């Protein structure tokens, strides 16, 4: 059985000129870099990002690359941190299945440790749609859908307190 973890992982976006105006200087974003826009990708962007590398290439007037120029000025990219989540796969599959065809959210946590074992928001969206450019009609559909599939009800929803199950 599969889970999509849509609202947990979140999605990535491409850095725009507007984003650069407000971006933290210490992360050194450049136009067309990729950044975490929502979910864990956004919250832990500062850890996951890593650092860009660069190297100078000698390219002639015909566009032919003749290799690296000034190897001592080369900087290798640095990988970002690895995160370990406390999500229980089987429980996550179950909560996503329970929410199928419903609008709502389920959060399963350990009250003693604060660990989140499952968290889902419905409706959601196909996370693979964010690989490559998103067709404008799909983006508009998501943003005009009255069920708000991009909205993470578990994190961003404001609800009055209700009864809780006490064990």
Indicate where each model-derived feature is located.
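Extracytoplasmic/periplasmic proteins that interact with beta-lactams or build/remodel peptidoglycan
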Residues: 1-105, 120-153, 158
């Amino acid at each position: 059985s599969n889970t999509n973890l849509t609202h947990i992982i979140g999605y990535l976006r491409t850095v725009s000129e507007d984003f650069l105006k407000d971006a933290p200087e210490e992360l050194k974003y450049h136009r067309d870099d990729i950044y975490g826009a929502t979910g864990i990708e956004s919250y832990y962007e500062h850890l996951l990002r890593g650092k860009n590398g660069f190297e100078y290439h000698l390219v002639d007037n015909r566009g032919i690359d003749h290799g690296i120029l000034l190897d001592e000025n080369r900087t290798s990219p640095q990988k970002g941190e690895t995160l370990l989540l406390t999500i229980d796969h089987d429980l996550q599959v179950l909560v996503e299945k329970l929410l199928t065809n419903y609008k709502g959210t389920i959060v399963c946590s350990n009250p003693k440790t604060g660990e989140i074992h499952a968290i889902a928001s419905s409706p959601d969206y196909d996370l693979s749609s964010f690989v490559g450019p998103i067709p404008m009609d799909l983006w508009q559909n998501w943003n005009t859908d009255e069920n708000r599939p991009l909205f993470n009800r578990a994190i961003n929803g404001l609800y009055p307190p209700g009864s809780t199950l006490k064990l």
